[in-house]
């Protein structure tokens, strides 16, 4: 006898169990709106702000406003995690979008994949989900540079002498960084970072890499009055409802194309759908 399971409902229930919620973030309305726009279009985003401004809190809550996995996405994600040996003993199917947050000491092989028998790296384990790189300039520049091509192609090819392996890597990149080595520029009157140190700090990130990050948003420090407020902000469910509506509009727009959301558009689609004001 056949058993029918409404996987869409199952995935929806799983995302509602997410441990973090946007209502827990005090203030930062502009940054929250930027996160919503990024989630709606699948755009990469970088948060620039001082320590304690809530950059990591915001990033960890992005999966809670993303649409539930489709069955196709769930199977793709499950295959990758299974190949990497990352599936739990009691898990047969990935039902929530992955959130990967590697440490800044990670090697290039661990990030993009590799080894004698090529294994998926963090960018593939984040496929259909979120890759969070906290304190982006602390990563080795060479490690970040190998991520440029996968960001563009949404897949990574690992070549060996006798064969090559392709792993998908269509993820939403969320990055964060301080505005200066000391972390508090320009508000710190005793800023200890020299112009040379500031330039060296910013030079850790190449122009081509930053070009692949669609949204750059400044996150201001939250004043005590805002932190002390009892009123909660919008919940992740409320924000996700708007994200879902935006994704539905995009699905209709691109129904004849192999595109699901705005971030996947190429030059032809941009010319057709993005009528820029003069």
Question: How should each PLM-predicted stretch be described?
Answer:
Residues 3-6, 47, 70-72, 85-90, ...:
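Active-site phosphate-binding and catalytic loops of NTP-dependent enzymes
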Residues 118, 141-146, 150-278:
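Basic, amphipathic alpha-helical bundle interface domains used for macromolecular binding and assembly
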Residues 1-46, 53, 159:
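Peripheral, non-AAA+ core regions of ATP-driven protein-machinery
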Residues 49, 113, 135:
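The Walker A (P-loop) glycine that initiates the GxxxxGKT/S ATP-binding motif of P-loop NTPases
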């Amino acid at each position: 006898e056949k058993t029918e399971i409404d996987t869409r409902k199952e995935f929806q229930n799983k995302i509602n169990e997410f441990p973090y919620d946007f209502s827990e973030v005090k203030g930062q309305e502009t940054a929250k709106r930027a996160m919503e726009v990024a989630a709606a279009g699948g755009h990469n985003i970088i948060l620039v702000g001082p320590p304690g401004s809530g950059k990591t809190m915001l990033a960890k809550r992005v999966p809670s406003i993303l649409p539930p996995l489709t069955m196709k996405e769930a199977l793709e994600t499950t295959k990758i995690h299974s190949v990497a040996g990352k599936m739990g003993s009691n898990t047969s199917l990935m039902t929530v979008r992955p959130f990967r947050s590697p440490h800044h000491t990670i090697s290039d092989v661990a990030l993009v994949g590799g080894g004698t028998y090529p294994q998926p790296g963090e960018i593939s384990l984040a496929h259909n989900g979120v890759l969070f790189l906290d304190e982006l300039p602390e990563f080795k520049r060479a490690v970040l540079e190998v991520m440029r091509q996968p960001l563009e192609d949404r897949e990574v090819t690992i070549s060996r002498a006798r064969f090559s392996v392709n792993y998908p890597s269509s993820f939403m990149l969320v990055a964060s960084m301080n505005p200066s080595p000391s972390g508090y520029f320009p508000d710190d009157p005793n800023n200890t970072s020299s112009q040379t140190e500031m330039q060296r700090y910013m030079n850790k990130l190449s122009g081509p890499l930053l070009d692949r990050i669609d949204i750059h948003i400044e996150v201001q420090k939250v004043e005590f009055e805002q932190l002390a407020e009892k009123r909660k902000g919008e919940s992740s469910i409320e924000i996700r409802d708007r994200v879902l509506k935006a994704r539905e509009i995009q699905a209709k727009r691109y129904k004849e194309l192999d595109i699901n959301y705005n971030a996947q558009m190429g030059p032809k689609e941009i010319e057709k759908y993005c009528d820029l004001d003069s």
